[in-house]
A protein has these predicted regions:
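TPR/TPR-like alpha-solenoid helical repeat scaffolds
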Residues: 110, 137-153, 177-188
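TPR alpha-solenoid repeat register
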Residues: 60-62, 101, 137-138
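Canonical positions in the second alpha-helix
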Residues: 90-91, 127
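Short coil/turn linking the two alpha-helices of tandem helical-hairpin repeats
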Residues: 39-42, 67-78, 106, 110-117, ...
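N-terminal alpha-helical interaction modules that lie
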Residues: 2-78, 82, 89, 158-207
Length: 207
């Protein structure tokens, strides 16, 4: 007998899941597992409805899974951005110091219309407030993000970005990123200190 293909989540399944999650605190703990299993399978509109319907408190792990799955879709649709924004805000309602969620909100804002609005700027400010340096991945991400909108960033955000460069330069695991940044970043104030911190790597001559 041929094996059956797994069915995609239906509205009825979503209602059952939400009803169960609303039943009590113990059931809410299941949301993280459920979200990770279903985020890739359901459409962005359905997942957005699910994320919005589930009250706080619930699971940071689940909200993070929903946000990451939404932003992994290509090409990104408005519904994907809405889902990632909703899930990120849910994360922050539980953990206001979650730097990844603040970074995501800034990214979503920029992806929405190609420029940072007041909300996106507030999110990147908050990112630096809760984690001025953070782990290497956070710092490298913020430099790359700043590069995308460098000319429109206020001086204090540029300064905060540049202040991370000496720290990144002293971390061995950032080597590959430093090589790429030294060779490819268009802004001298970024690539010059990174090249200086990456011995043996030269920036190709301008053509």
């Amino acid at each position: 007998m041929a094996s059956r293909r797994p069915k995609k989540p239906t509205k009825a399944l979503m209602k059952i899941a939400v009803s169960g999650l609303l039943a009590g605190a113990g059931a809410l703990a299941l949301f993280g597992f459920y979200a990770e299993m279903q985020a890739d399978a359901m459409g962005p509109e359905a997942a957005t409805s699910l994320a919005a319907a589930i009250p706080t408190p619930a699971s940071i792990r689940g909200y993070e899974a929903l946000a990451q799955a939404a932003l992994a879709r290509q090409p990104l649709a408005p519904a994907d951005l809405d889902l990632a924004r909703t899930a990120s805000l849910k994360t922050l309602s539980l953990d206001p110091g979650n730097v990844s969620a603040w970074n995501r909100l800034a990214y979503i804002d920029l992806a929405d219309d190609g420029r940072l609005s007041r909300d996106g700027m507030a999110a990147i400010y908050k990112s630096y407030e809760v984690s001025p340096y953070g782990n290497p991945q956070v710092m490298m991400w913020r430099v790359d993000f700043a590069t995308r909108s460098w000319t429109s960033l206020p001086d204090d955000i540029r300064r905060a970005t540049l202040d991370q460069l000496p720290v990144i330069g002293g971390i061995y695991v950032t080597w590959d990123w430093r090589v790429e940044t030294c060779r490819e970043n268009p802004y001298p104030e970024i690539w010059q200190p990174i090249c200086a911190a990456t011995p043996g790597i030269d920036r190709p001559a301008a053509r």
